[in-house]
């Protein structure tokens, strides 16, 4: 059997601005993100460090889009798995325009990394027992969340937790 090809993109980067969320006529959510990935290197001749940042357009569909709109904020680090897709349209002057986007839908993955701006803005500050959205992994529209964040809300503990910050539920 002949292979038809592979179209898979994996990115780890930082959100450039808060997600823009729209809803389609059928009620499905669509979130548009800009994601920055950077690489640094040292120039041999003078030892100077250089950096190049690449900006990616990411379009997230369904439940993933709703989660992105609730938890992702400018500066947040995120892991994205999706597919490349190029769209064509005609602008007002009749010129054909193209844009290439990373599409994240049912087969894609979005995982929020780190702590930076991972709490929704409308929630008040809570004790650091469970960082909202941190480490939340979502694969496709079928799983809303994985890990302890998927459980029902719990009452905050009477005493503050120790200062260490790790998750014993990590499967590796």
From Swiss-Prot:
Membrane-spanning ranges: none
Important for interaction with partner proteins, short sequence motif: residues: 167-172
Ranges where the SSB domain occurs: 6-111
Statement: the UniProt record of this protein carries the keyword DNA repair: yes
Biased composition (Low complexity): 119-153
Keyword terms: DNA damage, DNA recombination, DNA repair, DNA replication, DNA-binding, Plasmid
Molecular-function annotations in GO: enzyme activator activity; single-stranded DNA binding
Protein name, entry field: Single-stranded DNA-binding protein 2
